[in-house]
């Protein structure tokens, strides 16, 4: 019989760790958090020092019962949740549920209330619950563990045999500073969500939510959108001269100075003047400088840079990246080798690398690429201020395990992410790349031109990996990227003018955020931490405060209104700098430098004042917000109001005047170049008047501006939604061309960019093997009319497996079926098993309206 019980969060992690521990250990999963604040009540006693009231999460009674039974037989209990605040809180709650005599839970569909249309279940004392006061239930559980039972905390940065052995040889105790930091964050978020969300329900519409950090992230997106709208493009010109020296080839030089000063050409008139002067000038090479330029590798990944690079290179959303990274960390089945953790812990802000890993990767570089690719000493990278250096960077657990060695055992997406992590880590310890750079300054009368050429001399780390660039970075580096090989040019040599190329340009607005650049912005501003970036982005997208179109984020009209209302009423709480300072205070709580209650008291003092004022002064969209528009029927001011299908303008003279119309704000997520060109006005087929873009119940459409006299409408077709494919970092297996992602009638698919010459296509998969044929992968599809989403095998019609629920690559913890599924019910989102006779089901998310909800 096993003498020790080990508790981890997931079945995958349990399988991997169990392989290394042997028969003296039983490893059980908790399936994530086991206790939390109540869903339907505040759960925080502000008057008693912000005392939280934690309950066993609805649907977790069976898990708790199983853990308590297993704990009865154990002499020692090892708590092995992830090495961060959330993991430490899980460990603290696990210890409580194993030692407390009485456990309480909120009454839910699985705790205390029978499900409808089902026969009464036979009584199971281990997991039954008795009703108490209609709201809280006391769970009937196996007895708590003996007071003599030892509780030990083990943490590991990677799940490998060596790391597991070292962790269990030197166990520690629960770090209550980490627990307090997590608890403080949870209470802060609960106070804001619980107190502010009902304001939005009252002033805007039910079902909306506010969050301490999500609102600040929304503010950042809104402010960027307004910068884009307010931007006024300015004209400017550049002039390039194509020149020849005594030896070929010809080359381009850019006009840089006039009369010894930097030249900026504002319009065509100035450009023509300089072009005429250059046409008549004599060109002489005044100076020729040659130097060696070195480019150094970037550090290995931290959480934020992993999310950014996966978005740039793989087009993965932040949530998807973290889900895949979690799988690679917890363990993947590698045939006879069994379950193996392939990467280190993925929630980290440290670039530190352990000595053993440094030795392994240096040996690999020398063996695989040659000694010339290995620097004399290992590279050490400086982590940002406040980074938790107890963690390492995100890296492969075994650098010698090359991506091609494990490809057969990974889904397509898992392989891509592992390859990215492996390449980045290996490149970070390689020699720098070397370029020969030549700069030629050319005098042409009163004007000076410059030509820059760069030639690779040694590829160094670029043989393995080159960091992707954001839109703005690419624009800034265009000229450097275009730098080509120059001919031999001698100082004093007279050059021949072949052609002049004046070009008109316009300054560009700041780019809208992508998921990658928003994470980068939040990190730079100190908003959020590695464990929260994914949830921040998911929340503002799921709440429809922000829309993502072709990878670009823009606020919805609802998002802008919510942001404006909250920032006006809670100017200090939702201030970017204040939010960043709160993150620093939570870090201080984690370090034991600040009492968690003191941090909460400082926050709540401001928050309570703002809340009281907001209840009285916040404007109501339901009542109508004033606008500059006037009613075209009676001349009274129009009000902006919220209806069932979104925002609309209504006459303030209601009920005497019932005039309404669509607001004239920009329809976000549809850029001007996505739809009809500005020069091509859409006219009504019925009356000939101009058509305008409107938003209705089923999306955006064209409507006649003559409404209500003419009620003609027609679909809005966006060229970008089918005709502009998105390039992928992958080549066509048939012709070698670049693969692109396209939007078809039944959803997204992947095709060759050389169409129609090459007709290679494949469906975009979820990265999950078909449970029926074990050969194809599951793909997202829509019914013929596009009304219903379902999932099917990529080998259709050979394999006809389909399912109406979203499949998850998470095994069932009860029957070990390879997949579980997700569905949305009135009581919330649940994860369940479809296998006959299993019955596993657990709530994974509260109903949308109850997330940080006010009392019903």
Regions found by a protein language model. Name each.
Residues 2, 82-84, 205-209, 290-299, ...:
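Conserved short loop/turn motifs at secondary-structure junctions
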Residues 16-20, 66, 89-97, 163-170, ...:
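Alpha-helical scaffold elements adjacent to nucleotide-binding pockets in ATP/GTP-utilizing enzyme cores
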Residues 159-241:
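C-terminal or mid-to-C-terminal helical accessory/interaction module adjacent to the motor/catalytic core
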Residues 264-299, 490-493:
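Metal- or metallocofactor-binding catalytic centers and their adjacent structured scaffolds
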Residues 285-288, 297-310, 337-345, 509-521:
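Short acidic, hydrophobic short linear motifs in intrinsically disordered regions
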């Amino acid at each position: 019989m096993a003498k020790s019980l080990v508790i981890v969060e997931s079945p995958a992690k349990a399988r991997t760790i169990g392989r290394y521990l042997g028969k003296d250990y039983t490893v059980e999963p908790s399936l994530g958090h086991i206790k939390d604040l109540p869903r339907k009540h505040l759960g925080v006693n502000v008057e008693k020092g912000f005392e939280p009231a934690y309950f066993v999460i609805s649907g977790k009674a069976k898990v708790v019962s199983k853990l308590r039974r297993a704990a009865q037989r154990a002499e020692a209990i090892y708590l092995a949740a992830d090495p961060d605040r959330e993991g430490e809180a899980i460990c603290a709650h696990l210890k409580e549920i194993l030692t407390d005599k009485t456990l309480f839970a909120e009454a839910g569909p699985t705790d205390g209330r029978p499900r409808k249309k089902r026969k009464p279940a036979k009584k199971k004392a281990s997991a039954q619950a008795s009703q108490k006061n209609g709201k809280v239930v006391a769970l009937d559980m196996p007895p708590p563990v003996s007071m003599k039972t030892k509780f030990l905390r083990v943490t590991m940065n990677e799940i490998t045999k060596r790391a597991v052995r070292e962790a269990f040889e030197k166990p520690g105790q629960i770090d209550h500073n980490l627990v307090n930091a997590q608890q403080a964050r949870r209470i802060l978020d609960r106070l804001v969500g619980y107190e502010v969300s009902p304001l939005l329900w009252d002033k805007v519409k039910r079902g909306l939510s506010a969050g301490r950090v999500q609102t600040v992230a929304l503010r950042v997106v809104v402010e960027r959108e307004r910068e884009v709208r307010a931007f006024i493009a300015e004209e400017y010109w550049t002039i390039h001269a194509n020149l020849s020296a005594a030896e070929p080839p010809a080359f381009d030089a850019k006009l840089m100075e006039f009369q010894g000063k930097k030249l900026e050409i504002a319009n065509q008139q100035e450009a023509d003047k300089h072009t005429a002067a250059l046409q008549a000038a004599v060109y002489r090479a005044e100076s020729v400088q040659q130097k060696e330029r070195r480019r150094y590798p970037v550090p290995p990944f931290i959480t934020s840079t992993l999310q950014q690079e996966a978005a740039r290179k793989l087009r993965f959303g932040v949530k998807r990246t973290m889900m895949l990274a979690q799988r690679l960390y917890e363990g993947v089945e590698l045939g006879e080798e069994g379950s193996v953790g392939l990467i280190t812990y993925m929630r980290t802000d440290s670039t530190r690398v352990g000595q053993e890993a440094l030795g392994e990767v240096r040996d690999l570089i020398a063996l695989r690429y040659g000694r010339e690719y290995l620097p004399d000493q290992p590279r050490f990278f400086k982590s940002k201020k406040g980074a938790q250096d107890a963690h390492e960077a995100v890296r492969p657990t075994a650098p010698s395990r090359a991506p091609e060695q494990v490809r057969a055992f990974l889904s397509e997406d898992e392989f891509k992410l592992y390859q990215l992590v492996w390449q980045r880590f290996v490149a970070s310890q390689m020699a720098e790349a070397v370029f020969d750079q030549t700069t030629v300054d050319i005098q042409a009368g009163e004007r000076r031109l410059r030509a820059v050429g760069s030639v690779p001399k040694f590829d160094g780390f670029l043989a393995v990996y080159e960091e992707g660039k954001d839109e703005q970075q690419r624009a800034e580096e265009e000229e450097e990227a275009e730098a080509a090989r120059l001919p031999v040019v001698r100082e004093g040599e007279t050059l021949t003018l072949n052609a002049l190329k004046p070009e008109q340009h316009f300054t560009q607005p700041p780019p809208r955020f992508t998921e990658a650049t928003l994470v980068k912005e939040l990190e730079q501003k100190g908003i959020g931490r590695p464990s929260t970036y994914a949830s921040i982005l998911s929340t503002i997208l799921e709440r429809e405060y922000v829309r993502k179109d072709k990878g670009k984020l823009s606020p919805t009209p609802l998002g802008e209104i919510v942001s404006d209302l909250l920032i006006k009423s809670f100017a200090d709480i939702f201030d970017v700098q204040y939010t960043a300072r709160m993150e620093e205070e939570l870090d201080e709580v984690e370090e034991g430098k600040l009492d968690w209650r003191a941090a909460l008291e400082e926050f709540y003092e401001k928050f309570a004042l703002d809340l009281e004022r907001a209840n009285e002064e916040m404007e109501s969209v339901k009542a109508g917000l004033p606008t500059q528009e006037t009613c075209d029927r009676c001349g009274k001011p129009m009000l902006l109001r919220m209806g069932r299908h979104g925002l609309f303008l209504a006459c303030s003279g209601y009920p005497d005047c019932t005039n309404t119309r669509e607001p004239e704000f920009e329809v976000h997520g549809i850029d001007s170049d996505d739809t009809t060109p500005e020069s091509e006005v859409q006219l009504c087929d019925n009356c000939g008047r101009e058509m305008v873009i409107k938003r209705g119940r089923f999306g955006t459409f064209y409507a006649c501006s003559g409404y209500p006299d003419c009620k003609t409408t027609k679909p809005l077709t966006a060229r970008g939604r089918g005709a502009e494919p998105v390039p992928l970092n992958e080549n066509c297996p048939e012709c070698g061309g670049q693969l692109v992602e396209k939007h078809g009638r039944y959803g997204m698919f992947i095709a060759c960019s050389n169409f129609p010459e090459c007709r290679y296509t494949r469906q975009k998969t979820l990265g999950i093997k078909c449970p029926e044929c074990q050969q194809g992968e599951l793909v997202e599809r829509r019914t013929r009319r596009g009304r219903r989403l379902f999932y099917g095998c990529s080998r259709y019609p050979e394999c006809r497996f389909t399912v109406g629920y979203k499949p998850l690559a998470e095994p069932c913890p009860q029957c070990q079926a390879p997949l579980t599924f997700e569905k949305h019910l009135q009581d919330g989102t649940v994860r369940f098993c479809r296998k006959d006779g299993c019955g596993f089901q657990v709530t994974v998310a509260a109903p949308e309206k109850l997330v940080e909800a006010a009392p019903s």
